[in-house]
Amino acid sequence: MMSSSSSEIDVVKTRIPTYDEDDDTILYAYETKPDFVNKEPNTVSDASCNTEEQQKTVNDVLIHCQVIYDAMQNLDKKIDVIRRKVSKIQRFRARSLWTNRKRYGYKNYSYQLAKKLKRQKMKKNEVHESFSYPESYSPTLPVSRRENNSPSNLPRPSFRMEEYQRAEPEEDPILSRTPSPVHPSDFSEHNYQPYYASDGAMHGSSSGPCLGNPGANSIYNTYSTDHASAAQPSVTSSPFENDRYIEEGSITKHPSTWSVEAVVLFLKQTDPLALCPLVDLFRSHEIDGKALLLLTSDVLLKHLGVKLGTAVKLCYYIDRLKQGKCFEN
C-alpha cells in the first residue's frame, strides 16, 4: 500500500496479475520514482548551504561592530587626553594672571617715584643754571666766572647786535675804512688787549678778528682822532686764529643779511663746543644768514647729516634769532 504522505505523482503504480480466474481481486504494486529519490537530498543540501551563508554574514556583521566599538573606545580615550591638556592650559593661564597681577597701590607708587625724580632733575637744572651768567646764550653750556682778583674783572659784553650798530661811527672817514668789529666772546683764559684801528694793516693775527677791551662800553670808545697817528702796540693773537677777516658790513642789524663768514662766527661764539664742528659744513654749503633762518631740524638731520643733539641746539638758537632776542627789530 502507498503511504498517505506520498502522492501518486511520485509513485509508479504497477498491476500484479493473479493466477486464479475465479478471484476478482486486483493487485497493484507501488514503486517510488527514481527522480524523486535523487531529488530529495539536493534540497536538503541547499538548505544547509543557505544556513551556513547566513551564519557567515552574521559573523561578519558582528566583527565589524566590534571594530567600530574599539574605534569609539580609542576616540573616547583621545578626547579625555585633550580635555586634560586644555584644563591644564587654562589653570596655567589663570595662575599666571594672578601671579603677575600688580599689587594694590603699585600705580600710585610709580607715580610718586616719577614725581620725585622730576623734582630732583629740576633741582639739578637750577644748580646748573646758577653757575652761568644771565647773558649766557647757550642753555646747556655754562659760562665760567672770573676770579675777584683778576685785572679784567669788568662787566662782560653780551652777544648784542645793537652794540655794533651803535659802535659804528658814520662821520669818521678813518673808521669807515676799518673792518667791522666782531662779536666779543667770553674766554676767561685770554687777557683782553687794547685795540687800535688805522688805515694800514692790522698787527697781530692776520686770519682772526681782534677783540676789544671789555671794560669799555664799545670797542670804539677808546679810539679818538688824537690817537690816529700814535704808534700801534702789538696785539695778542685771537682765540680763533684760523678764521679769516670778516668783510666790512657783513654783520649787520638783521641776521638775514649775514654773510657765510658772519654765520660761521655766530656758530663759534654761540656754542663753541657743540657748533664748531659745523663750521666746515656751513662753509661747504655756503649757508648765509637767509639760509640759516630757513634751516629746520629735518633739513639738518636728513640732508646735512647733523646729529640729533646738535640739530636741536642749533634750531633753538635759530628760533632765538627769529624772535629778535639777539638783535633789534
From Swiss-Prot:
Single biological process term from Gene Ontology: negative regulation of DNA-templated transcription
Expression by tissue: Highly expressed in testis and pancreas. Preferentially expressed in the germ stem cells of testis.
GO cellular component labels: nucleus
Domain SAM: 258-325
Spans annotated as Disordered: 125-194
TM segment ranges: none
Gene: SCML1
Domain of life: Eukaryota
Residues annotated with Phosphoserine modification: S138, S238
MF terms (GO), sorted A to Z: chromatin binding; histone binding
Pfam family for this entry, one: SAM_1
Keyword annotations from UniProtKB, A to Z: Nucleus, Phosphoprotein, Repressor, Transcription, Transcription regulation
Sequence ranges of Basic and acidic residues compositional bias: 159-168
Principal location listed in the UniProt entry: nucleus
Membership in a protein family: Belongs to the SCM family.
Function: Putative Polycomb group (PcG) protein. PcG proteins act by forming multiprotein complexes, which are required to maintain the transcriptionally repressive state of homeotic genes throughout development. May be involved in spermatogenesis during sexual maturation.
Organism: Macaca mulatta (Rhesus macaque)
Gene3D superfamilies, sorted: Transcription Factor, Ets-1 (1.10.150.50)
Subcellular location: Nucleus
Name of the protein in question: Sex comb on midleg-like protein 1
InterPro entries reported for this sequence: SAM, SAM/pointed_sf, SAM_Scm-like
